[in-house]
Swiss-Prot record:
The gene is rplK. This is Large ribosomal subunit protein uL11. GO terms for cellular component: cytosolic large ribosomal subunit. Transmembrane segments: none annotated. It comes from Streptococcus pneumoniae (strain Hungary19A-6). PROSITE patterns: RIBOSOMAL_L11.
Amino acid sequence: MAKKVEKLVKLQIPAGKATPAPPVGPALGQAGINIMGFTKEFNARTADQAGMIIPVVISVYEDKSFTFVTKTPPAAVLLKKAAGVEKGSGTPNKTKVATVTRAQVQEIAETKMPDLNAANIESAMRMIEGTARSMGFTVVD
């Protein structure tokens, strides 16, 4: 019989840098997970994505065992990396802080495709372009 999921924990952790310190430790401690076991396994799985923030969904079972699924980095993080800026605009409708090309948007959309609710690459690109505009980025051809 399948194990019963007791709790779902969602976190965003820098790749390869999960530590038992806050915020990871307390969130996992409340769920009753072996914190060191999770941090070692997460760091091993995400070592190749250094510098990125990785969303992770941890399923905690009744017997306190767990499994986790890593997602693709948030679109905003990928856009900031592509544009080479630290953060988006505080007033995106007035102040544009960077430009990204449609080729960069397509590359980000292809990376994000498994996690996006999009039927094809064009609709995924439109979602990423919307995120870029809301961050104060200009999308150019």
